[in-house]
């Protein structure tokens, strides 16, 4: 399996954010996501909160899909 952490950095402008709650500001409770350059269907997720600055997770599309479907099912959410 390709080591996603060896691929180039994601530019800040490439991130899209998904927000909810907004505990302390406009983008305080967001998860940002962007495609990883040089990879097919790989993504970087990061925390938008100041305390989470610099914390990043790289995952494949299959890993994100599995998480999203499992999370929605566990929480009783409809897709």
Region annotations inferred by a language model:
Residues 70-75:
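A short alpha-helix/helix-coil micro-patch that ends at or immediately precedes a cysteine
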Residues 17-69:
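A short, structured beta-strand/loop element
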């Amino acid at each position: 399996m390709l080591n996603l952490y060896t691929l180039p950095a994601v530019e800040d402008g490439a991130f899209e954010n998904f927000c909810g709650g907004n505990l302390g500001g406009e983008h305080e409770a967001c998860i940002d996501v962007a495609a990883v350059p040089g990879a097919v269907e790989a993504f970087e997720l990061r925390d938008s909160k100041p305390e989470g600055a610099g914390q990043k997770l790289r995952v494949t599309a299959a890993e994100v899909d599995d998480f999203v479907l499992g999370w929605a099912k566990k929480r009783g959410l409809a897709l």
